[in-house]
C-alpha cells in the first residue's frame, strides 16, 4: 500500500505535492478544465459554440466567461482538426456561478475593455491635426525669418500670384544672392550657401500657384536663371564679371540639386575650374532654349525656392500642363533641351476640337464610328452571314459607310436604294449583268424565269406574290452556291385566293433590298443565260430542306405546285411579251429536265403529315405568304 500511495501521488494535475504516507488510495479532485473543441477552423469570435459566424451571429463573443456550457442539440460537421487546449489561450478560473446558465450575464462581458470615441466627443486633436498645426507654425516662422528683405513672396497658402510681380521681385534677389555667394570662399560655400536649399512645403504651395496661374512648374531653377542671365547679358554687357559669377553660382546650384536630395543645404562644387566648365556648358544651353513669355513667367516661381533658407527640398514632381489639364504652352526638362517647342507639342490630329482646357484628347477620333445603337456597321454585317428580314427593314448590303435617315438604314454607295414601290418598274429596266455561281462558275438565271410572267398576268394580285417568289428563288441559289444563308422557300401560292396578294403585300417589306435588287438583275438575265446543273441540284436540295423546316406538305399539293411552275416557265420562255394564263391552271406537261429530279426529292420527303383537302390547299397558301424569312409562326388568321 505504501508503494501504491507513493506511485499515485504524481498522478495529479501537475500541482506540487509533498510525499505523504496514506493508508488508502486517494485522488485529487479538481474542477474540470476547458473542453477540447474538435471543430477548430471556423472559430468566429462572434459566433456561438464555435459555429460559423454567419450562421449564428448575435454580436456575442465565442468564449463565454465560464467554460462549461451546454452543447447545442445539433453539431455542424467540420474538418478533422487536432484538439486544442484552450486553457493556454484563454485561462479561466471557474466559479460556482459559472455552472448555471441563468447567471451567465454576470460573466458575459468580463475581461473585455473597449474604448470607443466618436467625432462629436473628441476634444483632443488627432495626430494629423497636430502635425498640420506644426507645419503651419513652421511655415509662419519661415515667413517671419524672410521678412527681413523686401522680397518676401512665400505664402503658406497657395495664392495665385501674378507673374510680372514675381519677375520684378526675383530679378533683384537672384542678383544679390548670386553675387554674394560667388564672392565667398569655395570652402565656406557648402556651409553658408543655404539659400539654395529646396523647400518642400512652400514649393508645394508654389506648385499650386503654378497650377492655378497657368504656369508649368519645373524641378530645377538653373534653366530659368540662365534664361534670366541671357536677358541680362543684353542689358548689362558692362558687367561681364558679375554675369559670369552669377552663371557660376547657378550652375553650381543645378549640379548640386540634381545630386543631393537628402540634406537641407545643397552641396555646391568647390573647384573653380569646374565652375568655368559649367559656365561654358550653361552658355551652350542658353543658346538652345528659345526665350518666350512663358519662360519669363515660369522663371521666378521656381527661383523663389532658392531665396529662402527652409529645411525642405523640391523633388522631381511629375506635374506638367498635360497632367494638370492646363493648356500646354511649353514643356521643358532641365536636363534635356530642344530647339523648338514643337517637339513637345502633340500633333494636330490629337488636339481636341472642342477647345477645352485639355491639351489633347487621349483617344483619337475613330474614322468610322457607329452613328446609332440600332445601326450595325459594315464590319458587323460582314461578320454575320446575313441580316434577317425580322432584324432590319430595307437594307442594301454594299461596302460603304452606313448613314441613318428616317429610322431606316441607308447606304452611301453607287447603287441607288429603291423602295418596294419602285421594284416592279425596276424589274423591266435593270441592266443585264453577269452573275455566276461561286462553286461551279455557271450563271444563275434559269430558275427565276418561272416567276417572270407574273408582272404581265395580274398587276395587283400576282405581281406581289411573284416578286416574293423572285426573292426566294434568288436567295435559294445564293444560299446553296455562295454562302450558307437562311432564306425562306418559295412563297408563291399556286392556288392564290384574292386575299393572298394582300398578305404578301403586308410582309413584302420585310425582305432585304439586297435580295430585291439582285432578283431584278436575275430576272433580266434569265432570258439570256442558262443555268448550270450544279446550281439546279443545289436549289432542289435547298428547297427540300426548307420545306422540312417550314412544315411538311402532302403529295398532291406539291405535285400541283411543281406542275404549275414548269408550265409557267415554259410559257415565259416561249412568249415573254404575251399575257400568260393564270396560276390557277394546274395541267401542263412536265418536260423540263430538272423537274423529275426536284419532284422526286420533294416527293420522298414531304409525306409526313397528311391533312384534309381543305386545309391543305387553303392553309398552305396562307402559311407561305404570311411567314417571314426568320419567322416560324403564322402572322394572321385564315378568315
UniProtKB/Swiss-Prot annotation:
Domain of life: Eukaryota
Transmembrane residue ranges: none
Gene name of this polypeptide: buc
Physiological role: Prion-like protein required for the formation of Balbiani body (electron-dense aggregates in the oocyte) and germ plasm assembly, and for the establishment of oocyte polarity during early oogenesis. Mobility and aggregation properties are improved by tudor domain-containing protein tdrd6 through interaction with dimethylated arginines Tri-RG domains. Establishes oocyte polarity through interactions with RNA-binding proteins rbpms2 and dazl, initiating a positive feedback loop amplification mechanism in the Balbiani body.
Organism whose genome encodes this protein: Danio rerio
Compositionally skewed regions (Basic residues) per UniProt: 596-609
Biased composition (Acidic residues): 225-240
Motif RG Motif 1 boundaries: 627-628
Residues recorded with modification Symmetric dimethylarginine: 627, 629
Disruption phenotype: Mutant fails to form Balbiani body, and vegetal mRNAs are not localized in oocytes.
PTM section of the record: Symmetric dimethylarginine modification promotes interaction with tdrd6.
Domain remark text: The dimethylated RG motifs (RG[X0-4]RG[X0-4]RG) motif mediates interaction with TDRD6 and is required for Balbiani body formation.
Region (Disordered): 178-205, 218-242, 581-614
Name used for this protein in its record: Bucky ball
